[in-house]
Amino acid sequence: MISNIFIFIICYLFISLSVIGYGLIFFSFNKNLKISLNFGYAGLTGLLMLCIYSYFSSFFYEHGSTHNLILIFIGFAYFVFFNLKKIDYHFKVISLFLLIYFVGILIYKSHDDFPYYHFQYTYYLTQMPSVIGIGNFNLGFRTPSSIFYLNSLFYLPIIKFYMFQMAAFLIFLYSNVILISKLIQDNINKKYNFLTFYYLLSFIFINIFFSRVSEHGTDRSAQILILILIGEILSFVNFKVKIEKHLSKLFLLIALIISLKAFYVLYIIFFSIILYKLVNSYK
């Protein structure tokens, strides 16, 4: 029992830090791509990178345990390399949240859709390449989501499929890191405005109503990201910000939200607000 929990903790840290590592790898390509020092945004960026990779790679080969182990190790190694010579404020924040939120991944009962098609879809991606027409076997297979493809990358040796809720948990974790980092930064700078209260209320709301990760399907993860997206849009519209980096944050959040469930493409309306702001800024 103790050995199983120890293995679970190791995999939990291994995956969580590896995803951040992939976000940092993306940031390292060009300084203009570094949208934030916040490890929460690095984590979300890493999720998007892995999501894109998993979609394309699934057509050519299965996401087996050996493949996934190598993939996750690369991200983890970069994260360790990145933080080898410095332990800054952002590292302390992510370490604290990893410690506090560990209990969130200890799931006793999953939500109703998980045994219906979430598990089957994810597990099938680990056993064979993606096949066109699989939706004829189960209606659930006709509604793909990035969360299934992400979870298929967390199928590792020994732990096997017991990390198939990890993608939803990571969105929950990184979103909380983003919110609390913004609150801490406002407190350090002694600059309080309506967004400070918005982020505080969002943090409280997420941790009360979305605290049960076992109930997270594709909807709730997207709803958490929508709360952050609204905050970033309000910041973009009402305050002077670096347009390029802020736009990158908005595109990142919108891309993740739409990838989780197709009907969230309706949130494309937010682009009209962004374009309106851009037009006015260049007048």
Annotated model-derived regions:
Residues 188-190, 226-246:
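Membrane-interface transmembrane helices that cradle and orient dolichyl/undecaprenyl
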Residues 11, 78, 90-113, 204-207:
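Transmembrane signal-anchor helices characteristic of membrane glycosylation enzymes that use polyprenol
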Residues 75-87, 267-283:
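Perimembrane helix-loop-helix junctions
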Residues 102-195, 213-215:
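Active-site lumenal/periplasmic loops and adjacent helix-entry segments of GT-C-fold
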Residues 58, 210, 246-262, 266-273:
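Membrane-interface alpha helices of multi-pass inner-membrane proteins
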Residues 1-87:
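Membrane-embedded, hydrophobic transmembrane alpha-helices
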Residues 66-67, 167, 208-235:
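Multi-pass, polyprenyl lipid-linked donor-dependent membrane glycosyltransferases
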Residues 55-63, 108-111, 208-218:
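Membrane-interface helix caps and helix-loop-helix hairpins in membrane proteins
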